[in-house]
């Protein structure tokens, strides 16, 4: 099997190859929190996604960074991608996803998006309601199913 997933992390040059998706959702704010994005990349590789994955976090955890520069990178990546995939495994206090809430509301009617969250995620009722209201779809509750649908859409 040849893996054709190109990963571009925050602040890296955006050399997008093929179809692209942006992994939107909480990022670790503490080195003890585990990022869900590694699992997402593994799933995309398992299903042989051929394209670029834009990941709005550093390859290696950095406690302090230039937030506004990263936000600028995020906005460029969000506007450049073919699909925004929101996965909101919100868990207090380390995986809040507050910026993700704003991005979700901003892009829900502007770009192609998919949305999901685990059934035990904290405080996601409003996102669920808005997604159902604006798309007519039910949120995914399984990361693998969400990403398989992403691949299908981008083919």
What do the predicted segments below correspond to?
Residues 1-155:
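Conserved catalytic or regulatory cores that recognize and/or transform ribose-phosphate-containing ligands
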